[in-house]
């Protein structure tokens, strides 16, 4: 744990910035709502927690803290215990779930475990207080996280939806929203917040392990981009945000188009062949999403769009172990 000794300021430009953002989106964190904040103890989540606690007097939120101990290093239990003690001193309710590397060994496993645990904790809080259900889960993702996610998904060949995946809010489950209030803050700014407000920071050694792809991007790729083009991290994050807006517009237009293309069994192939290859790919992506099918890469969507085009024969394409797309002269169907 690191700590500074400066005098805390009651209201800063950081408070004002978040306050203005929340006022412009009143449904993001509604007045008087119950909030469950995921706190690792690192600079981003501690900065978020402090700002939320200071704004609490204006919004009258009920704040709860959740911590996930992955057990990936020897200090993880100590970090959890010290964070719990700090939260108790702040008179905050604190909840902790623990796992280990045998159960959660990859970045994706860890992310899925965290969200599953957060959803369960939110449900428990709602059950304990039906009059004040916990419908908002907060994380300390920043502009840097969005840039790293963008680069990872770009390298993997993600479609537009994948490139705009880290959003300010999204639905985790019915009546439970994931909110990222400081997504427009940079990591440089969160460390400044922690320094100015005398906040403790717990350093997670696993964050420096470049065996994990996100850490490798953070340690090796981002510094090169910044040396070539200073502030590129923020510009890439802003691009991802614009793509999010574009994807939402595309989502609405695709739904309108699907209304004319849907049949009792799937999609009308004769109508689909009249569209351009690019538009077919957009429609297919939306159709698959609506049917809760796995997200295909841009390359897979282009390949599928090409195969169902004009003057192409019948065929099929596996999209998971238990799901395939089959098409004939008249229709395009999902087959289990």
UniProtKB/Swiss-Prot annotation:
One record GO biological process: tRNA modification
Keyword annotations of the record: ATP-binding, Cytoplasm, Ligase, Nucleotide-binding, tRNA processing
Catalytic activity: cytidine(34) in tRNA(Ile2) + L-lysine + ATP = lysidine(34) in tRNA(Ile2) + AMP + diphosphate + H(+)
Residues the entry annotates as binding ATP: 40-45
Pfam (any one): ATP_bind_3
GO cellular component: cytoplasm
Ligase as UniProt keyword: yes
Record-level Gene Ontology MF annotations: ATP binding; tRNA(Ile)-lysidine synthase activity
InterPro entries in UniProt: Rossmann-like_a/b/a_fold, TilS/TtcA_N, tRNA_Ile_lys_synt, tRNA_Ile_lys_synt_N, tRNA_Ile_lys_synt_subst-bd
Record has Ligase as a keyword: yes
Major subcellular location class: cytoplasm
EC number of the protein: 6.3.4.19
Enzyme type, top EC level: ligase
PANTHER family attached to this UniProt entry: TRNA(ILE)-LYSIDINE SYNTHASE-RELATED
Free-text function comment from the UniProt entry: Ligates lysine onto the cytidine present at position 34 of the AUA codon-specific tRNA(Ile) that contains the anticodon CAU, in an ATP-dependent manner. Cytidine is converted to lysidine, thus changing the amino acid specificity of the tRNA from methionine to isoleucine.
HAMAP family referenced in this protein's UniProt entry, alphabetically: tRNA_Ile_lys_synt
Domain notes: The N-terminal region contains the highly conserved SGGXDS motif, predicted to be a P-loop motif involved in ATP binding.
Entry protein name: tRNA(Ile)-lysidine synthase
Protein source organism: Prochlorococcus marinus (strain SARG / CCMP1375 / SS120)
Name of encoding gene: tilS
């Amino acid at each position: 744990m690191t700590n500074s000794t400066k005098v805390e300021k009651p209201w800063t430009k950081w408070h004002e910035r978040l306050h203005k953002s929340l006022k412009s989106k009143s449904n993001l964190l509604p007045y008087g709502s119950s909030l469950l904040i995921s706190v690792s103890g690192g600079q981003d989540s501690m900065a978020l927690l402090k700002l939320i606690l200071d704004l609490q007097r204006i919004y009258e939120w009920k704040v709860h803290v959740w911590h996930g101990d992955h057990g990936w290093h020897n200090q993880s239990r100590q970090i959890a215990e010290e964070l719990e003690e700090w939260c108790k001193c702040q008179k905050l309710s604190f909840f902790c779930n623990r796992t280990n590397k045998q159960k959660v060994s990859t970045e994706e496993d860890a992310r899925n475990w965290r969200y599953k645990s957060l959803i369960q904790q939110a449900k428990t809080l709602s059950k304990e207080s039906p009059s004040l259900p916990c419908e908002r889960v907060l994380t300390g993702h920043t502009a840097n996280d969005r840039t790293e996610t963008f680069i990872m998904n770009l390298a993997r060949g993600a479609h537009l939806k994948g490139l705009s995946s880290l959003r300010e809010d999204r639905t985790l489950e019915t009546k439970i929203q994931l909110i990222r209030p400081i997504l427009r803050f940079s990591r440089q700014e969160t460390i400044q917040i922690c320094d100015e407000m005398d906040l403790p920071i717990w350093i997670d050694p696993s964050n420096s392990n470049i065996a994990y792809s996100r850490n490798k991007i953070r340690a090796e790729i981002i510094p090169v981009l910044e040396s070539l083009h200073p502030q590129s991290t923020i510009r890439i994050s802003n691009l991802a945000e614009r793509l999010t807006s574009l994807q939402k517009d595309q989502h609405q237009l695709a739904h309108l188009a699907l209304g004319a293309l849907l049949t009792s069994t799937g999609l009308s192939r004769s109508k689909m062949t009249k569209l351009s290859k690019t538009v077919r790919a957009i429609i297919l992506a939306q159709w698959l999403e609506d049917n809760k099918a796995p997200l295909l890469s841009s390359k897979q969507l282009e390949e599928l769009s090409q195969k169902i085009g004009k003057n192409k024969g019948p065929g099929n394409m596996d999209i998971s172990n238990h799901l395939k797309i089959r098409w004939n002269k008249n229709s395009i169907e999902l087959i289990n």
